[in-house]
Amino acid sequence: MPLNRLLTLGVGVCTAVALSVPVGAVPASASHHRTGGSLVLVGGAHADDNREIYEDIVRLAGGPGRARIGIVTAAAPVPAEDPDAGTPDCNNSVCNGDYYAGLFRSYGAADAQWIPIDLDHPGAADDPAVVRQIESLTGFFFGGGDQYRYVTTMTRGKAQRDSAALAAVRRKLRGGAVVAGTSAGAQIMAGRDMITGGSTEPGLRDGAKPGYFDDPAVLGYLPRGGFGFFTAGLVDTHFSRRGREARSIRLASDTRHARVFGLDENTALEVTGVGGRRTSLRVLGQRGVSVLDLRRARVTGHGGVWGVEGVRWSRLTAGDAYLAPRWTVVPAAGKSRVRPAAGPCTATPSEDVFYDYAMVGLVEEGLAARTGCVAVGGTSYEKDPQWAARLTRGAGFAAYRGATATTFTGVVIGIRAA
């Protein structure tokens, strides 16, 4: 898969736009509440050879030879915006739709087809033929790009109500279908205060602002959220690869959310029983899904600069489950407990702590590795101002070794101006 198809695309507008997007859900019938549908939320950079995740989506859509999957790529640029249109390096709504359709067929789907909604054809989201197409399918996959494009193409009017197509997808989800997405396609599943963009260091300094912004540094959010399919907490993608732990903490603090789910690249959070009586969450894929718990967090202000203490951090890896009502991590069977070895701390403080799995590395190489690592941390690369992160073992700290990544729970995060 071309690298540029894995990257998030920003779309410029002239001014910040304050928006509100209702989830517009219709109460499900009693029969729907008994089971519900499924979500598969991928943190971006979804490798085309990640058999575990693709086959899971096909399974949830009815299984090999039965699954019929609709591909939605409205977050991508349209062909006229793509300088590589018509080449193997294309990255646009049409070629991405064809690409994913072929990929899902290669993983056993009986059929996979593009749903023709994009910025060139927003009216298609109210076309009865498109609604009939959606009603014939058993699963859906939303591609990456800019999640705000999903808002502009699939919601309607000043009140941002569901288009006919989105309402049909919502009904299918309640009725048992799977809805999956990667990067922006996962982000759009979120409920209120969905993030629209923003860099970590400016976001920490200036705080979160409602709306969609041309400046990619502004930490923006939509107060009424995305499609509202996933409401157990805020969602962020490309999480530890892009060091988004801190920006998510600031957004959650400013919008008074107690929990954030951070999805790493090439990794998925599977949610089954959506809208049903029992909802289950588990992790699949290469890296991890972070859960940030702000229930006991407190905002500080050193020298008038925002800071926070007491954020609890857990990270689940492949096979782990999460009990959302209990805020509890359940490590997968067979994972061995990691016991810190006796001795002084050898973990090196990070000089770029909000980037490229730096904070995960501090836990794995510090808190989980040596008893002498009472606290680990580092500073931000940016220096206007420079930020410091401090990680300590909280009550109930534990780490477990997985095949490709380490599960941990009970890490406490503090962030302040350096």
How would you name each of these model-derived features?
Residues 141-144, 168-169, 173-193:
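Catalytic nucleophile loop
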Residues 89-91, 106-130:
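Functional beta-strand-loop-alpha-helix junction segments that form "active/interaction loops"
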Residues 147-162:
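Glycine/threonine-rich flexible loop motifs
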Residues 134-135, 173:
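A short, aliphatic-rich alpha-helical micro-motif
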Residues 71, 81-83, 100, 111-116, ...:
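Divalent cation-coordinating acidic motifs and surrounding scaffolds
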Residues 158-171, 207-210:
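Cysteine protease catalytic core and zymogen-processing segment of caspase-like enzymes
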Residues 31-65, 71-94, 195, 200-418:
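C-terminal and late-domain segments of enzyme folds
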Residues 1-30:
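Secretory targeting and sorting signals
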